[in-house]
Regions:
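A short hydrophobic beta-strand segment most commonly corresponding to one strand
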Residues: 6-8, 32, 46-66, 187-188, ...
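An N-terminus-focused feature that recognizes amino-terminal "leader" regions
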Residues: 1-23, 141-148, 234-236, 269-273
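Conserved short histidine dyad/triad with adjacent acidic residue
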Residues: 1, 146-154, 165-180, 217-218
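Contiguous mid-protein beta-loop-alpha structural module that forms a pocket-lining wall or clamp
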Residues: 36-93
Length: 274
């Protein structure tokens, strides 16, 4: 189908076949499915395989264009310059000094293609880098995380064009500074315990819990208890909102919000912490 997916494995092992790539995965690995890429999952391990999949299918269903094919036949790539590729592209040209331009139809139906690859973020590799963030001091005001970045999304900061996936380490006793943003977030906690405050209400969570942790524009923060660190996967529709110029973000509730991607964003005190 035309959905762009992000997947993670909750338990078990297996192989994701995405296009012409085979991706062997283990627990907590993350990978993506480019839109329209033929894909299937195989449980070639000895245990039950449980996966979480995040996709834009719901949005496409609301648009009434959610198209899915079962057992599709692989298509042959069209020959360059053939009828299917539409020939050459015409250049857009400016009509004033501010940048308003006109683009010919030949380019409208043949935009510059950018390959979309299946990518894999093994948890073992990600964790080795993530654990280094656990040593940042308590005075740090940012989040101890890495975005699983797909370079195809460029400045839109995505794992797919619609979503980002981040992995967070939360050392014992860390309480985040409250903030809010238009983008919505879903957290999957897979190690440790803690709580979240969302619009003034407290929610307790533990490893294995899945939570809509930040509805759009809801003030929220998260905290870990003192006994052990937390690992969590967050899925958020930030890239889509950046592209729509709708990503209003308030990192500090005492300061004005900003539209990320259109205006300058925020800074942390990372350089001043150890």
């Amino acid at each position: 189908g035309q959905i762009g997916d992000t997947g993670t494995i909750v338990t078990g092992t297996g192989t994701a076949h995405v296009g012409d790539r085979a991706i062997p995965f283990e627990r907590h690995d993350v990978w993506n499915h480019p839109a329209y890429a033929i894909h299937r999952h195989v449980n070639d391990g000895d245990d039950l395989q449980v996966r979480l999949t995040y996709s834009n299918a719901a949005l496409l269903e609301m648009m009434r264009v959610h198209l899915v094919e079962e057992d599709p036949v692989p298509e042959q790539a069209p020959e360059p310059g053939g009828h299917e590729t539409g020939g050459g592209r015409g250049e857009a040209f400016a009509i004033d000094e501010h940048g308003a331009s006109l683009m010919p139809y030949e380019t409208l139906i043949n935009p510059q293609p950018v390959p979309s690859k299946a990518l894999h973020w093994p948890w073992r590799t990600v964790k080795s880098h993530l654990d280094e963030l656990g040593g940042i001091g308590q005075e740090y005001v940012g989040r101890r995380l890495y975005l699983l970045y797909n370079p195809r999304t460029e400045r839109f900061n995505g794992t797919t064009p619609n979503f980002f996936a981040t992995m967070t380490i939360r050392p014992p006793g860390i309480v985040d500074r409250p903030h809010r943003h238009v983008s919505s977030a879903i957290n999957y906690y897979f190690h440790g315990t803690g709580y979240s405050r969302v619009e003034g209400r407290r929610y307790e969570w533990k490893a294995g819990d899945l939570m809509v942790s930040a509805p759009g524009w809801a003030v929220h923060n998260h905290a870990s208890y003192d006994d052990e660190q937390v690992y969590e996967l967050t899925i958020q529709d930030q890239p889509l909102n950046i592209f729509m110029e709708s990503l209003l973000w308030q990192e500090d509730l005492a300061a004005p919000p900003r539209i990320l991607g259109t205006s300058e964003g925020f800074a942390t005190n990372r350089g001043a912490t150890s």
